[in-house]
A protein has these predicted regions:
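Bacterial Sec-dependent N-terminal signal peptides
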Residues: 1-28, 215
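Outer-membrane beta-barrel domain signature
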Residues: 22-25, 54-59, 91-97, 127-131, ...
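Start-of-domain marker
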Residues: 24-81
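Residues that define the transmembrane beta-barrel architecture of outer-membrane proteins
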Residues: 28-30, 62-64, 98-102, 132-136, ...
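Residues on the lipid-exposed face of transmembrane beta-strands in outer-membrane beta-barrel proteins
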Residues: 34-38, 68-72, 104-110, 138-144, ...
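Repeated loop/turn-to-beta-strand initiation elements of outer-membrane beta-barrel proteins
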Residues: 42-48, 77-82, 113-117, 148-153, ...
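Transmembrane beta-strands of outer-membrane beta-barrel pores
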Residues: 50-56, 84-90, 110-114, 123-127, ...
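Predominantly the C-terminal beta-signal and adjacent terminal strand-loop region
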Residues: 155, 166-167, 171-215
């Protein structure tokens, strides 16, 4: 059963990776980050995240980011969360600019044997250069998490929808993300992933590493 489930997940990832891309010129980027989580109580956790992103085929810095957040476990299947983000962005041809963002949302999850399914809904509001942008983010994720395995694969799809205008039923952004979490111990892990990001103006191929610490 384990081998069958693993083949299904990896097969789906492989099929996605082999899909033909559109005719737009794609850009390659990288995301590198460190995330620290701390359990305040058995239900409440605080987290901090530092991240660096590149763009233009790894030639330019895109942004530096910091996130502070809280999440609360309501019950065995529902978790609430909220966070604040600060970005220092490289606006090509202009001075770097600061951007502020907050997010609130919830994640519901269920497990079947060692396969975990989750659906996350987030409201996101961003303040940048005197403008406000609102988005609804919907992410569906499936992961295979055998307790004794060091490497645990996952795949997620996330949809960004505009809020506050007639374009709600359009996709401002879609992210397809296969990856693996390498669990060195209960406290230390490394998330290695590829993300295909689609936007109407163009697409990005993103490779990422995130070091995770839990206390």
């Amino acid at each position: 059963m384990r081998n069958t489930l693993l083949k299904l997940i990896l097969g789906g990832i492989g099929a996605f990776m082999m899909c033909p891309v559109n005719a737009q010129v794609d850009e390659f980027s990288s995301w590198t980050g460190v995330k620290v989580s701390y359990g305040i109580t058995s239900r409440l956790k605080a987290s901090g995240h530092l991240e660096f992103r590149s763009k233009d085929n790894f030639k330019e810095a895109d942004r530096l980011g910091m996130t502070l957040g809280l999440n609360y476990k309501m019950n065995s299947w529902l978790r609430m969360e909220g966070s604040y983000e600060f970005h220092y962005r490289n606006v090509s041809g202009r001075p770097w600019k600061a951007r502020h963002r907050y997010k609130v949302g919830a994640t519901g999850s269920v497990a079947w044997n060692e396969v975990k399914f989750s659906l996350r809904e987030l409201f996101q509001e961003t303040f940048f250069r005197g403008e406000v942008e609102n988005r609804l983010r919907s992410r569906l994720k499936v992961s295979y998490e055998p307790e004794k395995w060091l490497v645990k694969p996952y795949y997620s799809t996330e949809l960004y929808q505009p809020i506050g205008d007639d374009a709600f039923f359009t996709a401002a952004r879609i992210r397809y993300r296969p990856g693996v979490v390498i669990a060195f111990s209960k406290q230390y892990a490394l998330d290695v992933f590829y993300c295909r990001q689609y936007e109407p103006k163009g697409s990005r191929n993103i490779v990422g590493l995130e070091f995770q610490l839990s206390f």
